[in-house]
C-alpha cells in the first residue's frame, strides 16, 4: 500500500456573496494554506445602484427617499447629510427645536445601528444568545421612530431647514422611559459578553491596527477611535447642537477587535446620556424654517410656468443650489459619512459624491486577515461593521 504525498499547493476559496457571515453581498476570494490565510481579495459591486448618478437628476427633496437605502440600518444619518449639504450651501438657519429633534433621532439611530452590529458580530464568533437579546431594545427604538416619523426604517423625516413633523404628544416621556430601561440592558450585555473567556479568546489581539496606520488608511469612526485616536466629528465639526451637551469621546488604545467592541458598547451609553440631556432641555418653537419655502428668484419656463410653490408646504423643486462646491460630513455609527456637493445654479446637483465610511474601512481587511486563521476572517470583518448598501452605493 502506497501512502499518497501531502498536497503542498494552495487552496482558493470563495466566501460569499451568499454567505451568512458576509453582512451583505460581499465576496472574498481567499487563498489558504491549510487553515492559514495567505491572501484575501474583496470583490465589490453586487449592490451597486448608481446612487451618485441618480442624485444628479433629482432635486434634494426628490432624492431624500433614495438616501435611506445607503446604510439602511442608520437611515437618519444619510438623511442628515443630504439636508445639511444644501443648508450650508444656502446658509439656511435651522430652528433650535428642530436641531434638538435631529440630535435625538441621530443618537437613537446610532444605538439601533450598534445593536444590529452587536448581535450578528456575536453570532459570527459563536455566541447566539445576544443576537436575540438585541432585538428587544431595537424594537423599542423602532416603536419610537414609528410614532415620530410614521416609518420603522426608511423614515424620510429630515427636511431642508428642519424636520417633517413635530414630536407627538407623550413621545418625550416614552423616550425617557426607554433611556432608563436601555441602560439596564447594556449592563446585561456587558455581563454576558465583555468578560466571557471564550469571547475574549476570539477577539483579543485579533485584527490589530495601530493609530498611525489607521490614519494612513483613512479609517474613521469606531475603527479609528479603537486605535487610540480620540477623533469624533460631533466634537470636531460642531454640527447640530452637540456642543450644548455634556458627553465624552469613547476610545481605546489597543486597536484590536475587542477594542472596537468596547468603543461601540460605550458609545451606546454616551448616546443615552446625550438623548436624556436633549429631552430635558428641548425648547419650544417651530420645527422647521418656513423661509426655506420661498422662491429665491422669479419663475421661469424651466418648470413650464407651473407654480410649484403652491403644491404643498414642503420645499418645492425650485430650491436652487448656488454655483459653489462644498464637503459636508457627519459622524455616522460606522465612521465619517461625507458628501461632496457641487452646485450649478440649478435645482439639481451638478455632482454628488458620497464618501461612505464602510467603503473606506473595508480597504484594510486584506491586510488584517493575512497570516491569520480562516476563522478569524469573520471576527475581523464583523468588527469593521459594514453595510453593502453604503459600500457599493
Swiss-Prot record:
Membrane topology qualifier: Peripheral membrane protein
GO biological process, one term: photosynthesis, light reaction
Name of this chain's protein: NAD(P)H-quinone oxidoreductase subunit H, chloroplastic
Localization (cell): Plastid, Chloroplast thylakoid membrane
Cellular component terms (Gene Ontology): chloroplast thylakoid membrane
EC number, UniProt record: 7.1.1.-
A Pfam family: Complex1_49kDa
Alphabetized UniProt keyword annotations: Chloroplast, Membrane, NAD, NADP, Plastid, Plastoquinone, Quinone, Thylakoid, Translocase, Transport
Species annotation: Ceratophyllum demersum (Rigid hornwort)
SUPFAM superfamilies: HydB/Nqo4-like (SSF56762)
Molecular function via GO: NAD binding; oxidoreductase activity, acting on NAD(P)H, quinone or similar compound as acceptor; quinone binding
Chain's role: NDH shuttles electrons from NAD(P)H:plastoquinone, via FMN and iron-sulfur (Fe-S) centers, to quinones in the photosynthetic chain and possibly in a chloroplast respiratory chain. The immediate electron acceptor for the enzyme in this species is believed to be plastoquinone. Couples the redox reaction to proton translocation, and thus conserves the redox energy in a proton gradient.
Record's subunit section: NDH is composed of at least 16 different subunits, 5 of which are encoded in the nucleus.
Catalytic activity reported: a plastoquinone + NADH + (n+1) H(+)(in) = a plastoquinol + NAD(+) + n H(+)(out); a plastoquinone + NADPH + (n+1) H(+)(in) = a plastoquinol + NADP(+) + n H(+)(out)
Top-rank taxon, per record: Eukaryota
UniProt key word Glycoprotein: no
Protein family membership: Belongs to the complex I 49 kDa subunit family.
Keyword Plastid among record annotations: yes
Amino acid at each position: 500500500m502506497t501512502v499518497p504525498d501531502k498536497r503542498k499547493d494552495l487552496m482558493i476559496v470563495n466566501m460569499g456573496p451568499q454567505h451568512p457571515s458576509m453582512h451583505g453581498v460581499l465576496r472574498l476570494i481567499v487563498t489558504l494554506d491549510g487553515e492559514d490565510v495567505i491572501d484575501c481579495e474583496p470583490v465589490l459591486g453586487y449592490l451597486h445602484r448608481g446612487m451618485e448618478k441618480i442624485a444628479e437628476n433629482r432635486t434634494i427633496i426628490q432624492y431624500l427617499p433614495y438616501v435611506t437605502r445607503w446604510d439602511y440600518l442608520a437611515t437618519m444619518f444619510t438623511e442628515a447629510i443630504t439636508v445639511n449639504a444644501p443648508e450650508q450651501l444656502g446658509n439656511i438657519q435651522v430652528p433650535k427645536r428642530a436641531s434638538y429633534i435631529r440630535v435625538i433621532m441621530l443618537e437613537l439611530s446610532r444605538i439601533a445601528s450598534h445593536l444590529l452590529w452587536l448581535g450578528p458580530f456575536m453570532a459570527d464568533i459563536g455566541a447566539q444568545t445576544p443576537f436575540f437579546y438585541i432585538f428587544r431594545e431595537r424594537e423599542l427604538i423602532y416603536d419610537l421612530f414609528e410614532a415620530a416619523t410614521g416609518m420603522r426604517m426608511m423614515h424620510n423625516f429630515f427636511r431642508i431647514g428642519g424636520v417633517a413633523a413635530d414630536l407627538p404628544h407623550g413621545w418625550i416621556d416614552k423616550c425617557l422611559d426607554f433611556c432608563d430601561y436601555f441602560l439596564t440592558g447594556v449592563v446585561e450585555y456587558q455581563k454576558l459578553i465583555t468578560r466571557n473567556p471564550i469571547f475574549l479568546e476570539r477577539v483579543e489581539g485579533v485584527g490589530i491596527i495601530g493609530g498611525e496606520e489607521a490614519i494612513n488608511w483613512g479609517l474613521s469612526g469606531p475603527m479609528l477611535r479603537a486605535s487610540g485616536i480620540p477623533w469624533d466629528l460631533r466634537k470636531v465639526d460642531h454640527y447640530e447642537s452637540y456642543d450644548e451637551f455634556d458627553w465624552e469621546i469613547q476610545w481605546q488604545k489597543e486597536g484590536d477587535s475587542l477594542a472596537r467592541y468596547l468603543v461601540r458598547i460605550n458609545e451606546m451609553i454616551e448616546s443615552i446620556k446625550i438623548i436624556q440631556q436633549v429631552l430635558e432641555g428641548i425648547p419650544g418653537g417651530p420645527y422647521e424654517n418656513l423661509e426655506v419655502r420661498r422662491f429665491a428668484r422669479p419663475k421661469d419656463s424651466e418648470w413650464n410656468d407651473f407654480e410649484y410653490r403652491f403644491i404643498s408646504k414642503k420645499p418645492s423643486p425650485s430650491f436652487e443650489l448656488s454655483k459653489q462646491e462644498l464637503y459636508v460630513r457627519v459622524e455616522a455609527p460606522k465612521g465619517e459619512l461625507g458628501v461632496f456637493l457641487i452646485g450649478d445654479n440649478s435645482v439639481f446637483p451638478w455632482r454628488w459624491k458620497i464618501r461612505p465610511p464602510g467603503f473606506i474601512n473595508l480597504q484594510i481587511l486584506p491586510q488584517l486577515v493575512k497570516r491569520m486563521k480562516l476563522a478569524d476572517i469573520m471576527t475581523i470583518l464583523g468588527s469593521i461593521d459594514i453595510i453593502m448598501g453604503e459600500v457599493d452605493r
